[in-house]
Amino acid sequence: MTELLSLAGVHTHIGRYHILQGVDFSVAEGQTTMLLGRNGAGKTSTLRTIMGLWQASVGRISLDGQRIEHSATPDIARLGVGYVPESMAVFSDLTVKENLILAARDGPLDDVRLEWIFGFFPALKRFWLSRAGALSGGQKQMLSIARAIVEPRKLLLIDEPTKGLAPAIVVGLIECFAEIKRRGATILLVEQNFFAARELGDTVLVMDNGKIVHRGEMAALASDVALQERLLGLSLETHQ
């Protein structure tokens, strides 16, 4: 498989804190890679560093063969990277339509692109002229993701999209991500919900204390409860 994203020896410091400590991994084109770990392991920090929100102190980050560790966030976005932060990235006072128009940096939204988005998120078509602040939590998350894919993306970085959502909404989001994946998207996804991770992931990376401590196939981790407990602190009750 073609390597789309790679990190080699990446360290990130925020003030006196050594957040990422020699992170090495790659993401293959067309794959969904889950980035798992306990709270504070460095998962969100990894996404922020890739996206240029935090600067790597040491190391190399490459996107499709191009070095980006010193690039600004807008430049990384222009290279085709979409980012969905943990806090839903929507403008509450604007309509769904206005939110998507603002996200389309390369020009007006055409009907073909809109129908492509509505294919993932039909609810957004129903609430096209509604203020984003009036949407439910699940609908806001859908809008946040739609903003990230309103333009063609090489890579999607998504941070805990199911956090705080009701189980029924989580199932709906999993179906949306599965469709995005079927259409060939490359995704690096941070997720605490192991059910969602198991359903979506092709490969998995586990972080602890700013380092990658496990890498492998998601199916292998999903079938090994003892390994889940050791790496993630999951208990048997988690699976019942």
Feature locations, PLM:
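A short, proline-enriched helix->beta-strand linker immediately N-terminal to the Walker B motif
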Residues: 150-154
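Conserved ABC ATPase signature
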Residues: 131-135
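Catalytic Walker B motif of ABC-type/P-loop ATPase nucleotide-binding domains
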Residues: 156-160
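ABC ATPase NBD coupling module
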Residues: 55, 67-88, 114, 126-129, ...
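The feature captures the beta-strand-to-loop junction immediately N-terminal to the Walker
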Residues: 36-38
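Helix-to-loop junction immediately C-terminal to a conserved catalytic motif
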Residues: 51
